[in-house]
Regions:
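Short, well-ordered secondary-structure micro-motifs
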Residues: 93, 233-236, 261-264
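Active-site phosphate/pyrophosphate-binding segments
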Residues: 12-52, 146-148, 154-155, 164-252
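Long, low-complexity, Lys/Arg-enriched
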Residues: 1, 263-266, 270-275
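Glycine-rich phosphate-binding loops that contact phosphosugars or nucleotide phosphates
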Residues: 46, 51-189, 226, 274-283
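Short acidic/glycine-rich loop or secondary-structure boundary segments that cap or lie
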Residues: 230-233, 259-261, 281-282
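A short, well-structured beta->alpha microelement
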Residues: 79-91, 250-263
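Short, solvent-exposed amphipathic alpha-helical segments in soluble enzyme
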Residues: 68-74, 119-120, 236-244, 266-267
Length: 283
């Protein structure tokens, strides 16, 4: 029998299409429940000593790495760095030693640059702490990681849990226990409610953007963000609009907007601004 997928129709409007509330709640709570495993691994890393923590990624995982690095930059004295995997493979980093620790994430577990990266890191005698979504993949193999957690999705949350415990260990997060108690009690339900509350707005946003794009297919859409939202800005433009929908985009940081981009923004130029709540919001 021929399979015929039922296509969503615009006339259906905002309808939380493909939204599975309980699955979403379970996914976030499952990630939060990884905290004891994360703390145990960080305790071991801390005991062994390190001269640098390197969040390294490619594409979307690089975006998440940028987010966690800027989050820690203004809060911690720990030596924390962010690197693009492909750049690290070609350029390296003279500060990187056999006492460095690399933290990575991968959905597929097979990404070419990340596989090459962990091999290079191990050649230098350094350690790799990996978050991998899919079991049985290349990056889960014993020779590709030193510390491993396999759990799907919630990449930024997992990175932030690492960051928070590192800062707690360094005496920089006094409210760590209270913070986690509140997160574990509320985060999953709050995130689900955000999806519900924003669905109507998201539908109108998407509908208007598609209508504009159909009339201006050669005009790129500009995305602007800063602070811990810049990684999301970069990822949303590249991974979602370009990679998945083949729509031309450009992402730029708020701090750079007035040094070039403002000169080409006119009345009908499509621009989306990501507004965060961290130290860089004034930008």
């Amino acid at each position: 029998m021929k399979y015929e997928a039922k296509a969503w129709k615009e006339t259906e409007g905002a309808c939380l299409r493909n939204f599975k509330e309980q699955a979403q709640i379970d996914s976030v709570n499952g990630a939060l429940a990884l905290r004891p495993q994360i703390e145990k691994i960080i305790d071991q890393i801390w005991e062994e000593g390190f001269d640098g923590i390197y969040f390294i990624g490619i594409g979307g995982t690089y975006a998440s790495s940028m987010q966690v690095e800027v989050y820690m930059r203004g809060r911690s004295k720990l030596p924390v760095f962010v690197e693009n995997a492909a750049e690290f493979l070609t350029t390296g980093n003279k500060k990187f030693t056999n006492k460095s620790v690399v933290i990575i994430s991968s959905v597929s577990g097979n990404t070419k640059e990340m596989v090459e990266l962990v091999d290079r890191v191990h050649e230098k005698g350094a350690k790799v702490f990996s978050f991998i979504d899919n079991p049985g993949t290349i990056l889960t193999q014993p020779d590709k990681q030193d510390y491993l957690i396999v759990y799907p999705m919630n990449e930024q949350l997992k990175f932030y849990m690492v960051a928070n415990y590192l800062m707690y260990k360094n005496g920089e997060f006094d409210d760590y226990d209270r913070y986690n108690k509140e997160m574990e009690a509320n985060l999953a339900d709050v995130l689900v409610q955000v999806e519900k509350d924003s669905d109507e707005w998201a539908y109108e946003y998407a509908k208007n953007k598609v209508a504009f794009w159909k009339e201006h297919k050669d005009l790129p859409h500009y995305f602007i963000g800063s602070g811990n939202q810049y990684g999301a800005t970069y990822s949303y433009a590249m991974c979602y609009w370009e990679e998945q929908m083949w729509i031309r985009t450009k992402s730029i940081s708020c701090q750079e907007f007035f040094h070039g981009m403002q000169e080409i923004i006119v009345e009908d130029t499509p621009v989306t601004l990501f507004m965060g709540e961290d130290e860089q919001r004034p930008l």
